[in-house]
Amino acid sequence: MAGEGDQVASDAPVPSAVADSNGVESGNRPSSSNPEPSSDKKRVRTGSQDIDMADAPVKRQKGVAPIKAECVALPNIFIIHRSDNKAEVKTAPIDDDAAEAADARHKAGDSRDNRAGAKGKNNKKDKKQKGQNTSRTFGSSHDKLPLCGTRALSNEFSAPECRFGDKCKFEHDLRKYLKEGRREDLTTFDGQCPIYEVRGYCHLGWKCRFVGSHSEERATEHGRQELVLREDAERKAKFAGLEDDEVEVVNILPKEVRFGLSRRKIGTPRSDQYLEWINSNKDQERELFDNNQGDTEALKEERDARRAEYVEAPFRPSEKRRLYYGPETPVLAPLTTQGNMPYRRLCVDLGCQVTWSEMAMGMPLIQGERGEWALMKAHESEIAAPRFQSKGTVVQGYDNAADIRFGAQIAANKPWLANKTVEVLTDNCPKLRAIDLNCGCPINLVCEKGSGSALLDSEAKLENILRGMNYVSKEVPITVKVRMGTKDNHPTAQKLIKRLVLGGYEALASDKGTSGVAAITLHGRSKQQRYSKSADWSYIAECASLINRLKKEKDAQTDTAAEADPRDQANGGHVYFVGNGDCYSHEDYYNHMNNANVDSVMIGRGALIKPWIFEEIEKGQYLDKSATERLAYIEKFAKYGLQTWGSDELGIGTTRRFLLEWLSFAHRYVPVGLLEHLPPNIQDRPPRFRGRNDLETLMASEHYLDWIKLSEMFLGKAPPTFKFEPKHKSNAYEIEAEG
């Protein structure tokens, strides 16, 4: 899920480091070993070097981005354009629950509030669009005359017979389809098909909107002109034996496995054995708690023997692949909707070292639902090893060459569901860095079922879920993402972390061992808080200190009854700790690394607004990206989207939809060259401003029509049937039919 955090206070000045669009640096790079955090007393003024602002204090308005006066276009208010040509003045920041696919039921006064609508039907037009769109639709993208599948991949005179004959509802006349049944070819990407460029063929054939780049008209031996599809034999040979959806993509679920899961013909033997073992021990555990003065060693040996009866050589957490987190491994948060494969691929290009899938629900996975399994797909760039410079704590046995970047995040509300989900994932997804259990999602739809943040109030249950996941996950490590707690001013994360690292009393007494998690990620907000306040990095720092103390405490438990079984401790007993919340610059990143003492920082909204934050972290400087460079990232996303979802009308529509989802965040970026002071704050909202050129101004627009214009630069004009509803109702868009 998305989310990031606020700065740790300090009296030391922040090093100034700003680069122009060509990456020319001014100032010093922050060092992970020599912390130089930011200060409210001394700030860096852009356009100059290391200016001490104590001599020339400038009042900074809370919640408002400090844009240079000459760039401000209107008074200091935020304006949202609407299709009725009215403007709604916005004085509060947009709720960023859109990054977590939040529903609107927690909001008062949203579209479900009938106070305004009770006056009658005629009042509907005056009703403001607020809150979240919970049941969104996106129209349809299809050809005017759908082409029959027997013709799609065949040359004009070589198509097989359609078994439906004249009764077929689809078009068989190829020339008629090309002339009347589809829109004209796109001229973007130099008119070259992005799929053909990689594969040497296009699996969409005549349906491709770039078909002119891989087709031609040839004369036959009978003097007729035939339309034929071209192929590049050399490039095509590189992917021989692969299905169309397996080119440059891993973790593809075979059709027969998906069919078997949906028909319940594929079992989960490891989970069944583990659950049977747990259930068989319930009576003995009760006896243990009734008489806890018994022979602990004898009971331990008895349980080991019983475990061997039910589970055949299970993988213990300590036998799993080792993980590593360090200053050189910034993490991209699991982002619902926005965290799709093309976007993750773009972030990896820009320096992201660890990626996570969108949160997948457990039940659809074990039922073989195609949409949920699609979330497990990863691009081949995500299975490369993350950067490794041995700057952090390296556990014994860590093999960077065997490590990859991509992990899967799941949500589950019961031990049996989590166990079975992990088992089918590890059996069918060979490229997973780790599997993360989401205990931070605050949305009602998830929490009402007992998943997400709801697990924070059930610590023993959560521990049991994670322990079971470890038993069935083979060599794949298990991690967990949590929040501070469920309620404001009542954080519970420290208590939970202690249980997860050391093990709860009942688990240790019954010899179940610790949870075995290899890493814990903490989002510095509560479930109730959402994004109304900045993330609490001081609390994250306290939790990081706690984990360091717990390591010493575990060492002190040697030869005691409370000692955890070393076989149940992942990463040789070292639990990595990752902070999450409001990271928006390399200064934020290194501040958190140095002052909160986390092993790494997970970045969500900051990466949505400016994906090159990973590049800034690597180079240790601000990068003042030009509008042209930012447009190139949009072009790259569009290209990756077409390679993922297809270059036909349907694939272009899907790519456009997810591009607009990203632009609903990316338009918030304020170029650092327009700011009076650094570092920028992700919670600050800018007044309406003029960019340094028309393109930069366009890219900062909150108007949904301008997002459409940007998409049309690379995906062509949106069809009349296209409809876009962003998660914020104020930005909803439905294209008007021409004429």
Swiss-Prot record:
Which intervals hold the zinc fingers (C3H1-type)? 143-175, 192-217
Q: Give any Pfam family that matches.
A: Dus
The active site is formed by C441 (proton donor)
UniProt superkingdom: Eukaryota
Provide GO CC annotations from the record.
Answer: cytoplasm; nuclear periphery
Localization recorded for this chain is: Cytoplasm; Nucleus
| Cofactor annotation | FMN
Q: Where is the composition biased (Low complexity)?
A: 8-37
- GO BP: any one term: mRNA processing
The UniProt regions of compositional bias labelled Basic and acidic residues, in chain numbering, are: 102-116
Reactions the enzyme catalyzes: 5,6-dihydrouridine(47) in tRNA + NAD(+) = uridine(47) in tRNA + NADH + H(+); 5,6-dihydrouridine(47) in tRNA + NADP(+) = uridine(47) in tRNA + NADPH + H(+); a 5,6-dihydrouridine in mRNA + NAD(+) = a uridine in mRNA + NADH + H(+); a 5,6-dihydrouridine in mRNA + NADP(+) = a uridine in mRNA + NADPH + H(+)
Q: What does this protein do?
A: Catalyzes the synthesis of dihydrouridine, a modified base found in the D-loop of most tRNAs. Specifically modifies U47 in cytoplasmic tRNAs. Catalyzes the synthesis of dihydrouridine in some mRNAs, thereby affecting their translation.
Assigned protein family: Belongs to the Dus family. Dus3 subfamily.
- The name on file for this protein is tRNA-dihydrouridine(47) synthase [NAD(P)(+)]
Natural source organism: Phaeosphaeria nodorum (strain SN15 / ATCC MYA-4574 / FGSC 10173) (Glume blotch fungus)
Q: What is the lineage of its organism?
A: Eukaryota, Fungi, Dikarya, Ascomycota, Pezizomycotina
Which gene does this sequence derive from?
DUS3
